[in-house]
Amino acid sequence: MKTDKKKSGIEPKVFFPPLIIVGILCWLTVRDLDAANNVINAVFSYVTNIWGWAFEWYMVVMLIGWFWLVFGPYAKKKLGDEPPEFSTTSWIFMMFASCTSAAVLFWGSIEIYYYISTPPFGLAPNSTGAKEIGLAYSLFHWGPLPWATYSFLSVAFAYFFFVRKMDVIRPSSTLVPLVGEKHAKGLFGTIVDNFYLVALIFAMGTSLGLATPLVTECMQYLFGIPHTLELDAIIITCWIILNAICVACGLQKGVRIASDVRSYLSFLMLGWVFIVSGASFIMNYFTDSVGTLLMYLPRMLFYTDPIGKSGFPQSWTVFYWAWWVIYAIQMSIFLARISRGRTVRELCFGMVLGLTASTWILWTVLGSNTLLLMDKNILNIPQLIDQHGVARAIIETWAALPLSTATMWGFFILCFIATVTLINACSYTLAMSTCREVRDGEEPPLLVRIGWSVLVGIIGIVLLALGGLKPIQTAIIAGGCPLFFVNIMVTLSFIKDAKTHWKDK
């Protein structure tokens, strides 16, 4: 069927610089993987040890800002004049769907192992204390604190969308109240947008780098096809081709249906793990972990370990705070767009409660299952990681469940669909951000979307070639540094403009 939707052209000043920068970095990495790994280790050490404290203070300050929004003068302000576009149930379900990416399935299953084997606060590895704090740290990293920071930025973007009626497709559009129209639309705004795009490209590449091995390991388990880097590259290529076909043939409705299937299948798979793994233990472990979280929360918030130098807060807390920072603008734009018509307080409470429930369910069920398999000596996670890699260890936590073949098919389909929708979202977001103003009824050009999906795929392959989690962690942390400042500027711009246009009556 023909469509009358218009296509908008690329914006050279934000299209070519990120393309060139990322292309050069990928080329330099592939030229010498060993040298690249040395640089990666140096960058990771410098940023986390020298500037890790800044990410921790950023999260705390944004949390204070959340309380100001909820209980301050803007709490009852509506984000747009229209009634809410979606029912509260649908709204929360859409937020849950945004949490069920393949990268989340990756971390949810294996993260607790790292916390138990290399615990914080001087605890002995694999001790009772380490196990007690393992899930508590997952609930900390994926709980109310980061979602509170996202809700603040979501309010900011919803304000610009629905109150100020701005067409926001890049962060520079929101900076006019802070730096003036001349700078926001000039060189300064262009630099901000390029920082945002380069960081977003690497973030999406890392998500693909986490997701792909899960699918290829599933293929090895189900079909006996050996997992190799070549197979990873082939699978990524197939996803890119599938995405191109979907876009070219106007199958975006099919992609949306796939996204819904992913959400329902996520509920089904989590329910299955919850029932067969040990529902009573999971609920008891969760309850105990919430208490542990509340007991250790002040130290977790500010833990940098300059005396013990264990490296735990740098490797995990700073890494995850950078992860949240780097995805903040993209996620907040999406969450803002589905929150039209709601009050500031409603958006803040809804996001923190709904999204915290989503991530806590994921991490509690999957993390508890991994811990049980380790405690019962069903799986030797360290040996699996040493001999076969992290992805194989994750697959084995699913394969160890009853009806293993059916379970693995469900997990395979879930990971495959999650990655297809990831690539589609990546290409669409990057294409929208690198084209001229895209208004209602317009779409970014097909070749631009395909081009960005290819580049994201290449980054995923490069990170897989480097091997291990450190390159992925470093890519996130390096990308999070510039966006740390961009997010702050967007926040300050909102506060400044709201004082003028949301005057107290």
Curated annotation (Swiss-Prot):
Topology relative to the membrane: Multi-pass membrane protein
GO molecular function: (R)-carnitine:4-(trimethylammonio)butanoate antiporter activity
Main location as per UniProt: membrane
InterPro entries: BCCT_CS, BCCT_transptr, BCCT_transptr_CaiT
Gene Ontology biological process terms, A to Z: 4-(trimethylammonio)butanoate transport; carnitine metabolic process
Compartment(s) of residence: Cell inner membrane
Catalysed reaction equations from the record: 4-(trimethylamino)butanoate(in) + (R)-carnitine(out) = 4-(trimethylamino)butanoate(out) + (R)-carnitine(in)
Quaternary assembly: Homotrimer.
Function: Catalyzes the exchange of L-carnitine for gamma-butyrobetaine.
Listed name of the protein: L-carnitine/gamma-butyrobetaine antiporter
Species of origin: Salmonella arizonae (strain ATCC BAA-731 / CDC346-86 / RSK2980)
Organismal lineage: Bacteria, Pseudomonadati, Pseudomonadota, Gammaproteobacteria, Enterobacterales
